[in-house]
């Protein structure tokens, strides 16, 4: 039983068309809450119709509507294409052009799904906005805290580190206490056709998985050839455009050499891709920017031992963090890590609690 307060309250559910948000809507409706479903149309409908297994595609909008009809709850589709293009797609493209490896799902949660959905939910008089994310909101001594979901295979806390304290107070994550199998069983119990619908896998606005086509469409002429240089300083060949490379990449370099080579650094200003041996990927310190902090404030000279994740699929690593001004932090691993990629998120944990996070910069990752 999920307790969201007064049963007469309006609860807006962000319905993506998948099984998770459908199960949330059905569960809250069954418990007597006044549920309203909202689905965002985020990109070109023609593209969406042809795209399967992606969040907020045309089929997903239809599926969300069918779930709402079955439950007998109001459902609205809001057109956020222009906002999504500006805040997410163009940010994604420009990040690649800066030699970064972007994380568009985090930008979408930050700039569109939470920010704008919360605004809409409040305009509808809702007491809370509920989503199908696998994270937990726990009331601590100093207010709401963001914790990992109990199902480690589905935990989505890495993608929600930009959630502010004010947003967290208004949000609800009922599925943080469920495993994926339990969610599907719940959806089946309510007779929802999406109970066995596959999870979304791809970036929603990349219809064929080829992000380079999207970049070249938004920013024509982006694939400019340039030099591939070894970290020791000698030229090895020519690259096909920095958008085709990411830190740690080994395959597709097109270079014959006497040892395996990896992408070590991308220099967008000079259009250079630096490569080197795997050992050159090792590093211990880096800087994160645009830090969002959900815990007690860190003092200027304080060093805090934490666990950090630098990729959604990696296990947390022990590190020490310290402040660098208002919105930056220095992160120092206790042991060296490989392939820390600018543009990715560094999310900071204390056990199961999310303390905050920021965006990895190229500062002091490597000095050539």
From Swiss-Prot:
Keywords: ATP-binding, Cytoplasm, Disulfide bond, Nucleotide-binding, RNA-binding, Transferase, tRNA processing, tRNA-binding
Residues the record marks as active site: 108, 204
Subcellular location per the Swiss-Prot or TrEMBL entry: Cytoplasm
Gene designation: mnmA
Annotated organism of origin: Rickettsia canadensis (strain McKiel)
Protein name, UniProt field: tRNA-specific 2-thiouridylase MnmA
Enzyme Commission number(s) of this protein: 2.8.1.13
Residues that coordinate or bind ATP: 14-21, 40, 132
Highest taxon listed in the record's lineage: Bacteria
GO biological process: tRNA wobble position uridine thiolation
One GO CC term on file: cytoplasm
